[in-house]
Each structure stands twice: as C-alpha cells, then as structure tokens.
C-alpha cells in the first residue's frame, strides 16, 4: 500500500532519468492472488498531475500497469461504471469476447512478440472477470457503520477503507493518492493547507493500521506513506521579493513512514542537520528504500530483473542496500 502526495513523480524530480515504477515491479515479481481483480490498483479522486503516467508500467509488460479508480464518486455503480456491461449478459459477453480474442490471437501469431498486444488481450479477460468481484470489493457501504465511523468521512478515509477491502481480496499493490493534481505542493500558505490535509488523512491512517492488526493482516501488509521530496526549512520568496508563507521543494532531506510487513515499529532512522535542510545522519537513497521494500516482500533486489533493450534491469539499477536497522 502506498500513499502519494500527488506530485509529478513521472518527471523524475529527484534526479533520476530512468523512470521506473516500483509498484509494477512488485506485481511483476509477486503476481496476483486474485485473478478477478487487478494486481495493482491506483485510487485518486480524479487524476494526479501527469495523470495515467503515474501508474503505467514503464518498460515492463503492460499487464503490470495499474488500474485507475476515480474515487470522487461515492456510489459503487459510478466507481466501476465502465466494468459492467448493462446491455449484454455475461454469456453474451463471453461469446463476444471469445470471438475478439480469436482475432487477437490470429493477429498476434503474424507478428513478433508484442507486449502491448499481449497486455491488451489479457486486459479484456481481466475486465470480464472483474464483473464477478469488483462491486463487492469497492462497496464500503457493506461495512458496519462502526467501521466506517472509525475511518472517518473524508474522501481519503473512504479510499483507505477500500484499500483494506482490496488487500483482503488478494490485490498485491494498492496505491492511494491524497487528493487530485498536487494538493501538497504548497508554495503558499503551507501551514494552513498542510494542517487541513493532515486532518483529512490522519484518522483514516490510524484506523487502517488498527483494522489490519485486528484482522491479522498487519504483518503481511507493508504500508508506505510519503512523497518524492519534502519542503525547505525556510520560507519561499517570490521573484517580486514577497513571501506567500510557503516552502519550496527539497529533495535533500525528508521523511517517509513504513509500517507492518516486517518493519520494526517505533524506530526512527536517520536525521537531518540542525536546520532540517538535508539528511546528515544515516541518509537513505531512493534505491535503498526500494531495496528494503523488495526485501520485506521476499525479494533479493539484485536478483529481481527484467530484460529490456539487451540488458537485465533491476528496480534499484546497480545501487541499493537493504536498511536492516528498521527490519524486525
């Protein structure tokens, strides 16, 4: 499970020019426990900046890309309105799909290996199977009122409750964006805005952790909360020399939260300098974070590879170390 700050992660703002998606790598490595639901689901009330680029699979096969659920709708029928076919029965759909798939396979046989075509063939089958289970999975109204009250009434709380329901049903990777576009990118009025945003998600995060513990899922679920950079410790000054009480981007020192899934609880690892500007003690690179996440999911990050352009690629490229001090 990963919560994002809804900024342009696909633009590689922390300096890497190789844009790869960690969640697609997890799905590639683990597969899916539930063949009726996608292995990677991305929820956002609308779209984050750069839209669908954020859950594409990079150079991995398209079957590992995420499925976007627009959570600005509260009705389950609206949430998954494009999954159900209201004109054809399941039997009629199956006959229609079998014919389309026959044509697709004949087309594929005349071409060299085409990952995009193979992904499309598989996506049609997944869309058909999703009709069996998607309605139940996304319908939080089936939860007792006490559970819904526990999570809270915000959009973010509702997304987190959906995330728990998806995890229960075997979805490997659930990504939860906090707000559409980039609400955390506050170059002005940062204190007021961040307090509001924190209030929208804090109750739901606490409820999710407690709920997973009570259901025996906490130790099997890795929760990662954070973004791709922090904010400067100093107020940002505009070109006109005025302050709007905001902060600029800062990739030199910021924090993330990991919980569950083999993480040692109550641990603080690393520290910034006295100004809160850059990591000064036990700095962690994004490759180290990825290596640690993969380790907690049962992978050796140096051995999980995908061959592309005549090279065996890793999520961590040629870098990365497992941060063993935070592992229980």
What are the roles of these predicted feature ranges?
Residues 1-9:
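Short, exposed "boundary/linker" segments that immediately precede the start
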Residues 11, 16-17, 21-328:
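Ligand-binding pockets and gating/stacking loops
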């Amino acid at each position: 499970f990963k919560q994002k700050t809804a900024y342009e992660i696909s633009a590689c703002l922390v300096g890497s020019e190789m844009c790869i998606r960690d969640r697609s790598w997890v799905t590639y490595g683990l597969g899916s426990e539930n063949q009726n639901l996608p292995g990677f689901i991305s929820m956002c009330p609308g779209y984050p900046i750069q839209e669908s680029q954020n859950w594409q699979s990079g150079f991995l096969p398209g079957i590992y890309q995420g499925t976007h659920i627009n959570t600005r709708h509260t009705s389950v029928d609206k949430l998954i309105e494009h999954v159900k076919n209201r004109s054809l029965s399941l039997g009629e759909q199956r006959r229609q799909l079998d014919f389309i798939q026959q044509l697709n396979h004949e087309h594929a046989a005349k071409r060299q290996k085409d990952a995009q075509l193979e992904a499309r063939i598989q996506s049609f089958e997944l869309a058909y199977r999703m009709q069996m289970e998607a309605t139940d999975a996304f319908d939080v109204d089936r939860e007792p009122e006490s559970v819904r009250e526990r999570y809270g009434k915000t959009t973010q709380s509702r997304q987190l409750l959906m995330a728990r329901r998806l995890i229960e049903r075997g979805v490997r990777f659930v990504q939860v964006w906090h707000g559409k576009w980039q609400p955390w990118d506050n170059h002005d009025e940062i204190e007021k805005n961040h307090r509001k945003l924190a209030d929208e998600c804090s109750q739901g995060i606490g409820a999710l952790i407690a709920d997973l513990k009570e259901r025996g899922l906490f130790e099997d679920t890795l929760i990662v909360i954070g973004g791709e950079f922090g904010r400067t410790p100093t107020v940002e000054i505009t070109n006109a020399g005025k302050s709007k009480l905001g902060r600029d981007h800062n990739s030199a020192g910021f924090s993330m939260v990991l919980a569950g899934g083999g993480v040692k609880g109550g641990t603080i690892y690393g520290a910034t300098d006295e100004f809160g500007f850059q990591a000064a003690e036990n700095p962690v690179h994004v490759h180290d974070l990825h290596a640690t996440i993969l380790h907690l999911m049962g992978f050796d990050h140096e051995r999980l590879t995908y061959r592309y352009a005549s090279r065996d690629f890793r999520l961590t490229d040629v870098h990365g170390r497992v941060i063993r001090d935070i592992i229980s």
